[in-house]
Amino acid sequence: YTGVSREYLIRHGLKIDDDDFRQEVLKPQGKGVSRYDGRMTRPLLEPEMDEIKKGLWDDATADRYDTYFYAALTGDLLPRLNVKLDRNYIALTNFYKNWDKDAPHGTTAEQLRNAMTRRPGMRTFFANGWFDLCTEFGYVWHTLDHAGLPKDRVCWKGYKSGHMIYIGEENIHELCADIRSFIQGKDPSK
């Protein structure tokens, strides 16, 4: 079960585009799924814009959290840390509407493999949210299986979260404990 309509699958030769999936899976209910957390939805208010921009211009998770992060960084957090920026902070959400989703994307797997080959003591910990549709765990698994990384020095763990694993009391405590464990030389996935 894919969640998208039979018509969509036939029209696209059984291939499901990531952006299309988020727009199609709850389309019958008039909703789009968040890229950053598949548990969050928003109404498909502007079908034409939703189709053209594939939801990058308006995301349920970004709508919920970006304002707080922006306010914390510009109004409270930076002064407490005694950080003074010589330029204005520009919120990422301002770029969504102009995002070029067709721009070529590279992979960092080769660079990671090279770095780990050159540094025999280097270890890598992948932490992913199960509901993250932005950096999907399937890509991590593919990288782990095909990038030639030294498997004895790579760990992976999934969390009950979206893209921002650190949101939520339970998640942040688990992630912090796992990072501490990793730094101490242990495998947090075990």
Which residues does each predicted region cover?
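C-terminal subdomain of alpha/beta-hydrolase-fold enzymes, centered on the catalytic histidine
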Residues: Y1-S189
